[in-house]
């Protein structure tokens, strides 16, 4: 479920497609990237979430939206707000525990908000040059190198 990789800079892009077999999209996406700067330099951060709903039109859409909301709120409260406020140091934050809790929060929210629905989810949290991933299901994370090489960073859960 979790993996850490060091990065020096990143570019973010996204696209959505319903494909050729469906008439609607059940995905939800959250992108937040920022930089705090002071006399000591900049501190980059980012939170990126993709959830792929399943279970039919309404249930899948509701499940993916609920999961994205729950994960983003959980990570902002436990990690990003203290990081931005500089009230705790990065080394004091248990990123793995925070990510795991956010996924559990998403599960609870989906059960409550989207009966009959479900979702896969991939979350990437970037603090300084460290990226921490958490995922459930077959939503994937890739590293695309400057040379165009592609490395899978996650392994699908079945």
Task: For every predicted segment, state its role.
Residues 1-158:
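PP2C/PPM-type serine/threonine phosphatase catalytic domain
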């Amino acid at each position: 479920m979790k993996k850490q990789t060091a990065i020096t800079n990143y570019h973010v892009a996204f696209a959505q497609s319903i494909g050729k077999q469906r008439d609607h999209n059940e995905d939800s996406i959250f992108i937040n990237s920022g930089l705090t700067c002071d006399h000591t330099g900049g501190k980059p951060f980012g939170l990126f979430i993709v959830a792929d709903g399943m279970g039919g039109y309404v249930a899948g859409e509701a499940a993916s939206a609920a999961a994205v909301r729950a994960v983003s709120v959980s990570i902002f409260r436990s990690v990003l707000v203290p990081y931005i406020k500089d009230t705790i140091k990065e080394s004091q934050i248990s990123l793995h525990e925070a990510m795991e809790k956010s996924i559990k929060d998403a599960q609870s929210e989906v059960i409550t908000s989207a009966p009959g629905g479900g979702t896969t989810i991939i979350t990437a949290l970037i603090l300084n040059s460290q990226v921490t991933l958490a995922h459930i299901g077959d939503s994937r994370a890739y590293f695309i190198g400057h040379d165009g090489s592609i490395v899978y960073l996650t392994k699908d859960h079945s």
